[in-house]
């Protein structure tokens, strides 16, 4: 397997993948990566990569910073070892990074931004460990330095150390600045030797300061002396620093103990973060090479659409289309050397290995790849040459090994099968090997430049010819794979283009037997036919795309027209509602003016009534379709008699017939107004049978009677409110000082609605619940003004 991974450049692909990891955890996972032969595992890996790609597509990034491989630290803490401050800081940073990633994934799931069942399960396994992180961060700063605030003792010791250091420096600087001692010093500085403060003294003044010599210069001319005056302070400083170190170790030991208490959770977190970093590296790499998730199968079927070798730059690669394992299980790619056949072979092999490693592949959507138990490749490489094997021996050694392992779950890639020996024998061997592997049910892709194998592909069921297109004009391969067309050597055409004399080419052709010449002509014809068919297909595809675009454009215009229609209808409806509102307000103003005249005892003249009617008619909105329908219904001939209660349809008001004026016109009393109304504008109102005799009031100037109470029981809320408004108007015109509105107790909704309406009514002086003998809470007594 190692050789296959090498010749198919799997390790080079992994180096590209390594560029996308975020931590040493992910790096280790990539370094350990090998293709899996377990179909279910490969499906799982692919699904994980797809979820990672979805997160990248939606968010653009995933927080994976600050994560370290802390397993060595955890193992040491578990056995009671002391962790250094920098190691504890890595533990805290990894806890924080894990918690941030957990929150990021779970937030996306909660907000339903993406369906992430696999990554969500990983996120759920991460233990937050906030208290442990906080404990470490309170003691250690971001540079790995233990803070003064880590303990009261440490704060005191550090204060003492700073005091001692300031004291000793002050004394030594006093010596260096003194004019009496300046000539004795090599330099006027204070420095440190053996963790003690010293000054540089010339050799000849060694005894001038007393104290201890800690070091000397390379020449011996300068001695680094700790003067006697600061020896005691330096001793105190050193002792304080020793105590400081012991206190730091105590703090680190305590924190290490806390880590050991959570070591199992931390191991889980590290494993989960390693997986998530690995998954996101695969997703990032897929994005970088414009890869897609392949469809997987375990039937040995390959369908690669516009597949690209990931190691070849985009501006140099020519995508390939290939199918294998359906109508044919062997593909023989023929043609001259250096024609791109090996690149095709490596692309098929590497994309298969990538898919079986959970990586998306650089190919178009709907590409399909099989999960093989074995992938074999006989492709020449430098290592075989270094082993001093001939080309033929190298190939044959590898082929013998392959034939000993190949089965129906294998993909076998042969490059230049049978090369390196006598062409006749080599071709015969190649055919025999292909037949043997085919009988075992393996999927085969083989390249060769032997003409004999072109005929082999035509004569065997389940075997297909293919070639890599070659441009004889530019004398270079186009690297386009042509399925169903065998390759030509193009030796004569190339030689002619390079300037070889025509007579030599003709002599060479004479040495080729007629059958071989006919085969070459047939292949040339096939190539031309295929090019023509592909050109026709491309034109048909273009026409189909143009037709589809036209359909989409027309659909958009239709949708736009529908939206415009809806907008116009909505605008018209809004205008109609406003017209009705304006008309109602105008009518209320006119009625209010007439009421005021009534209250003032002013006699309403006929011309005033006519003017009011005219204003009402002007205020009335244009009839809607529904109103027109009602009007047409009302236009049916009908007879009314004096006293009939009617509804005037154009005003929506009730009144009663005073007299018949003409064949199709009646005088109608509406409140204080009398007006002539066409019969078609009237609707008869059936009078209810009287239940009991109640005292009635008569509206002045009319024979319309108004009862002293209004019974709303059984009425719907909206209709009840309208009846209350009209009843109050009628009661005012009838001269009542107070009236009763019977609404019943029920749910209380009707009672509340009546109370609210009465509070807003300008002519209601007060309203109270009925007394014990007045119906109680089921009745409201209204005092009018």
UniProtKB/Swiss-Prot annotation:
It comes from the Bacteria. InterPro entries: DNA_mismatch_repair_MutS_C (IPR000432), DNA_mismatch_repair_MutS_core (IPR007696), DNA_mismatch_repair_MutS_sf (IPR036187), MSSS (IPR046893), MutS (IPR045076), MutS2 (IPR005747), P-loop_NTPase (IPR027417), Smr_dom (IPR002625). Transmembrane segments: none annotated. Residues 710-785 form the Smr domain. Keywords: ATP-binding, DNA-binding, Endonuclease, Hydrolase, Nuclease, Nucleotide-binding, RNA-binding, rRNA-binding. Endonuclease that is involved in the suppression of homologous recombination and thus may have a key role in the control of bacterial genetic diversity. Acts as a ribosome collision sensor, splitting the ribosome into its 2 subunits. Detects stalled/collided 70S ribosomes which it binds and splits by an ATP-hydrolysis driven conformational change. Acts upstream of the ribosome quality control system (RQC), a ribosome-associated complex that mediates the extraction of incompletely synthesized nascent chains from stalled ribosomes and their subsequent degradation. Probably generates substrates for RQC. NCBIfam families: mutS2. This is Endonuclease MutS2. It comes from Halalkalibacterium halodurans (strain ATCC BAA-125 / DSM 18197 / FERM 7344 / JCM 9153 / C-125) (Bacillus halodurans).
